[in-house]
Amino acid sequence: MEGLEENGSVQVGELLPCKICGRTFFPVALKKHGPICQKTATKKRKTFDSSRQRAEGTDIPTVKPLKPRPEPPKKPSNWRRKHEEFIATIRAAKGLGQVLKEGGKLPPPPPPSYDPDYIQCPYCQRRFNENAADRHINFCKEQAARISNKGKFSTDTKGKSTSRTQYKPPALKKFNSPGTTSSGSSRLPQPSGTSKTVVGAPSGKVSSVSSSSGNKLQTLSPSHKGIPAPHVGTNIKPRNSTPPSLARNPASGVLTSKRKTYSDSYMARPDGDYISSFNGGNTKGIEGNSAGHLPKFCHECGTKYPVEWAKFCCECGVRRMVL
């Protein structure tokens, strides 16, 4: 350069490239540039932190630089195993399509493939990535503990319910009245020969309800209240006995006078109840409470009832019978 300044003219010559950075210099300048370029190439330059420069002269404290995290080691790729599984699935799909076209027995499905890099959960047997497995296993552990506790509570409640249902009340003591020797003080109805006749049963069918007049007399007697009962005669008639005028004979021709019997002996009400009168007394009954069987066809005109709960015939208007 001194020679250039002295002469006052620019020397034109060949430019030589630098071996390190590749730039071209004159031979005189290249001798000075060579050691400087080599030193800067080997020396690592610190990264410039602009946040520190901006924080200078303010109250903001300088933040410590974060240390770079070491990169995790790369896992070896299992590309060969994945390739073989892919080929196996394609072959299985082709074989299934061929069997469906030709017809025949279906081949067994290919075995499931598992990624060896995944971690299996010991509670639900599912597989997850490392990061997901750390979160899932703790959650699944809590869920399994809750389910086991619920099972314990359910067994405890079952035991309590069984103990409640198996409870039996203490047996009542029976006290015999002083006037009787048998255990007649029980209030439960006992079977007897008397029966209650249901009025209006067709074709002489009579539905009898067992009742005991002796029990009713005994409950109304003074001996039921702890007072000695007087001598009861044997010729006492039961209160609910059937009058002889209402007793029907199956051999009599009742089938010809069904409509007349229903119209004379029953008084229908709009709510579906009926009143049967005999000997000056009224007896109320409900068809829903009767244990009889309802016919499917009308006994007057033979028309089939459209619904099971019909009370009257839709053609002739006659009330439905109770068998």
From Swiss-Prot:
Modified residues (Phosphothreonine): T242
Domain of life: Eukaryota
Phosphoserine PTM sites in chain numbering: S221, S290
Gene Ontology MF: a single term: zinc ion binding
Region (Disordered): 42-81, 149-258
UniProt keywords, alphabetically: Metal-binding, Phosphoprotein, Repeat, Zinc, Zinc-finger
Sequence ranges of Basic and acidic residues compositional bias: 47-57
Keyword Zinc: yes
Biased composition (Polar residues): 177-197
Binding, Zn(2+) 2: C121, C124, H136, C140
Pfam families listed in its UniProt record: zf-C2HC_2
Biased composition (Low complexity): 198-214
Family: Belongs to the ZC2HC1 family.
Protein name according to UniProt: Zinc finger C2HC domain-containing protein 1A
Organism from which the protein derives: Bos taurus (Bovine)
Gene: ZC2HC1A
